[in-house]
Swiss-Prot record:
BP term (GO), one: positive regulation of branching involved in ureteric bud morphogenesis
Protein's name according to its UniProt entry: Glial cell line-derived neurotrophic factor
Record's function text: Neurotrophic factor that enhances survival and morphological differentiation of dopaminergic neurons and increases their high-affinity dopamine uptake. Acts by binding to its coreceptor, GFRA1, leading to autophosphorylation and activation of the RET receptor.
Disulfide bond positions: 134-195, 161-224, 165-226
Organism whose genome encodes this protein: Xenopus laevis (African clawed frog)
Length: 227
């Protein structure tokens, strides 16, 4: 429900309640018209001398008498309910005004920040893809799986180099590539750089199934490069 509609409902309720005027001595007459406490006895109901209590409208003006008869008994309760409803509505309006939606400028800033974050993540991913040329990989194997003729239950982490070396690593590689493209080195076959180990792990020593001691050297890569 919109704010202007809520305000209109509050105004209508307040005007409907306030449209019934209160007479000047209505409250006094209302108090006199209440029944007395049962503990005070029957004498207080009919008066000490047996006379009938005074009519609360006796001292009212004619227009007040007519208004008094038209006012419902629960008029004050209805009025309090309407006032309480209006107060709750005003509090709700204040809370809703404090939660205003972001302006167009704020939405633009949020969108710009989100786009910047997405672009930065994309740039990092692109860099990782470009640098995935020659990389060091690892696999868990048994020594027997190496195919070197050893029968043993010993295991190891075999590291190897994988990837391409299309991007020249040095100026020398760039020159060789340019000369090959321009066919300046027709008689000589120049090999392209390949991804190979430039450093190896430490030696691996183990016992085979016949309890014979063996040592493997330069068996696993430690660092890779295009050479």
């Amino acid at each position: 429900m919109k704010l202007w509609a809520i305000l209109a409902v509050c105004i209508l309720l307040l005007s409907s309640v306030s449209s019934i005027p209160l007479p000047s001595n209505w409250l006094a007459g209302k108090k006199r018209s209440h029944l007395p406490d049962p503990q005070e006895g029957e004498d207080q109901v009919f008066g000490m001398d047996g006379a009938v209590p005074e009519d609360p409208t006796a001292n009212m003006a004619p227009q007040d008498q007519q208004t008094y008869t038209e006012i419902p008994d629960d008029y004050p309760d209805q009025f309090d309910d309407v006032l309480e409803f209006i107060q709750d509505t005003i509090k709700r309006l204040k809370r809703s005004s404090n939660k205003q939606p972001p302006s167009r400028r704020d939405r633009g800033r949020q969108s710009l920040a989100a786009n910047t974050q997405i672009s930065s993540k994309k740039t990092v991913k692109d860099r990782k893809r470009k640098n995935k040329g020659c990389v060091l990989r690892e696999i868990h194997l048994n020594v027997t799986d190496l195919g070197l003729g050893y029968e043993t239950k010993e295991e190891l982490k075999f590291r190897y180099c994988s990837g391409s070396c299309n991007n020249p690593e040095t100026t020398y590689d760039q020159i060789l590539k340019n000369l090959t493209i321009r066919k300046k080195l027709v008689n000589d076959k120049v090999k392209q750089a390949c991804c190979r180990p430039i450093a190896f792990d430490d030696d691996l020593s183990f016992l085979d199934d016949n309890l014979v001691y063996h040592t493997l050297k330069q068996h696993s890569a430690k660092k890779c490069g295009c050479i």
